[in-house]
Amino acid sequence: MEKHLPLIVNGQIISTEENRFEISFEEKKVKIDSFNNLHLTQMVNHDYLNDLNINNIINFLYTTGQRWKSEEYSRRRAYIRSLITYLGYSPQMAKLEANWIAMILCSKSALYDIIDTELGSTHIQDEWLPQGECYVRAFPKGRTMHLLAGNVPLSGVTSILRGILTRNQCIVRMSASDPFTAHALAMSFIDVDPNHPISRSISVLYWPHASDTTLAEELLSHMDAVVAWGGRDAIDWAVKHSPSHIDVLKFGPKKSFTVLDHPADLEEAASGVAHDICFYDQNACFSTQNIYFSGDKYEEFKLKLVEKLNLYQEVLPKSKQSFDDEALFSMTRLECQFSGLKVISEPENNWMIIESEPGVEYNHPLSRCVYVHKINKVDDVVQYIEKHQTQTISFYPWESSKKYRDAFAAKGVERIVESGMNNIFRAGGAHDAMRPLQRLVRFVSHERPYNFTTKDVSVEIEQTRFLEEDKFLVFVP
């Protein structure tokens, strides 16, 4: 089986018929057209979205989202088929991914709130706002490169939407492990209106990291901001080849875990933990890989967790695993058993629970494997937090998180959520300890003239006169 994905350059669909890159998914193949110097020139010379106001942008995204909301939308149906056929997603998981794309695009209020909380105002990109002794306005950085990872398809959607919400041109490098999501999103914009400035502002490309990346490096040298997702090698490549004067937003590998503090409702606690383990099969930075349990219902909780992991295998089945992934999963089980750890696993390798002392962890194969650690008190967890490495801590009960959030945050945790909510990034929250939209705009200040008196100095700022009369200190508050 073979699928062809054409280039998208400034919203134009281009098939080159030559120099196509090939990505293999076992016996299935995806062929993607390569870009050349002409395409590079076209992208570099393209305008941004300066003439669009925020209402125009969000209304267009909403219109696109309404298409994704329809289960009869051909682009959505093709996308779901690709996730199942090529990436091994279960039908339920693939459908959920498409549903989330619809949800994100259609959530107009959330999009406005994201701009408001991250940039300070929904109007700051459309007009000059008085702030202190200045007028301030946010302008797009310009050309933004989005180097996507394939472990979490929605991260690519999020990255592109951040670029659009800040009125930037988006040049997207698809991931070899998911060449479908960014491409389908861009094509859905074209479906709505091929001549819309948003459609024309997006390019979707691909190049293998192992190939000659000279042209890709040249393209990167023209960027005004780079958003890099993925492993350390991908992040290092982006930093190495980006211009030294621009921002590189780095979303690298992170680890997350769950803290259970004397849970009273074991049914609810186990449901939340199972969700945080099973969503994306632990391939996301926010996925729970370890559970720290404080309380006297430890054995009962484990039984409930087994029940909920089996439930999730029905409602959100695990994606198809490669031979290597299956082998690593089995080897981890054998290694832990040989080391004397207690292992609870499912005959078909659909999930695995490993019990160990806090801090004891062998290989982690992901794929719905979780280490469970019995602790005396929640304060003991602080020592296992690694600054710049620990992203999300899921708490149950949520009220317990208020007691420990200061200590956990001071140690380096970047995000604290209720158990069962790790995949939902609330509007207003930070992402990897930053406000990404702030780094995708240029804040320009138009400062008041000399005769504008300040709160501290109630006279006109006549600096030449101050020097002539040597009266500077008179005006120091």
From Swiss-Prot:
Record-linked SUPFAM superfamilies: ALDH-like
Family: Belongs to the LuxC family.
Gene3D superfamilies listed in its UniProt record: Aldehyde Dehydrogenase, Chain A, domain 1, Aldehyde Dehydrogenase, Chain A, domain 2
Entry keyword set: Luminescence, NADP, Oxidoreductase
Biological process according to GO: bioluminescence
Key word NADP present: yes
Keyword Oxidoreductase assigned: yes
Organism name: Vibrio harveyi (Beneckea harveyi)
E.C. code: 1.2.1.50
Reaction catalyzed: a long-chain fatty aldehyde + NADP(+) + CoA = a long-chain fatty acyl-CoA + NADPH + H(+)
Pathway assigned in UniProt: Lipid metabolism; fatty acid reduction for biolumincescence
The name this protein goes by in its record: Long-chain acyl-protein thioester reductase
Lineage: Bacteria, Pseudomonadati, Pseudomonadota, Gammaproteobacteria, Vibrionales
